């Protein structure tokens, strides 16, 4: 199973997918920059218990974050809980997405994940809408090119 974690400014969205890609559960936690890795582990363990799944059955995890102060603790918590580090969406991760922005590092990992997911489901051109703490509209043109938002 795959555990997907999206750390936003207001909430942390957590989803568990089985090997066929079906959603098994989706949950949300408050984003709290003060939490330690141990506290995050307890929160995740409680979610697995709440939804009647075993975290020991998770084979992989992926982390997407727009809250840099939480990145280290979240990575540490996922590594401790699952026994191996998560894939972290960020600079250097090969997505097959061409980004046409002057400063690509200003593009949030959540927006990259949105665009890649949209391209897995639909053919370009595509308009994406991310409704996190801030609402962001993006445009993906032919050739898997993110034009901006």
Please name every model-derived segment.
Residues 2-6, 62, 126-130:
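Short glycine-aspartate micro-motif
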Residues 76, 81-87, 93, 97-149:
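Phosphate-binding/catalytic loop of phosphoryl-transfer enzymes
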Residues 55-66, 85-87:
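Short glycine-rich phosphate-binding loop at a beta-alpha junction
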Residues 13, 72-73:
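Phosphate- and divalent-cation-binding pockets in alpha/beta enzyme and binding domains
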């Amino acid at each position: 199973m795959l555990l997907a974690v999206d750390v936003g400014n207001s909430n942390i969205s957590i989803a568990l997918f089985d090997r066929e890609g079906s959603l098994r559960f989706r949950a949300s936690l408050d984003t709290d920059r003060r939490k330690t890795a141990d506290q995050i582990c307890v929160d995740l363990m409680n979610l697995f218990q709440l939804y009647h799944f075993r975290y020991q059955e998770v084979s992989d995890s992926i982390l997407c974050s727009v809250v840099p102060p939480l990145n280290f603790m979240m990575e540490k918590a996922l590594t401790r809980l699952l026994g191996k580090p998560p894939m972290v969406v960020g600079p250097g991760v090969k997505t097959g997405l061409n980004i046409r922005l002057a400063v690509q590092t200003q593009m949030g990992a959540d927006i990259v994940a949105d665009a890649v997911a949209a391209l897995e489901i639909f053919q370009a051109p595509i308009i994406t809408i991310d409704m996190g703490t801030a609402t962001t509209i993006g445009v993906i043109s032919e050739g898997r090119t993110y034009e901006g938002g």
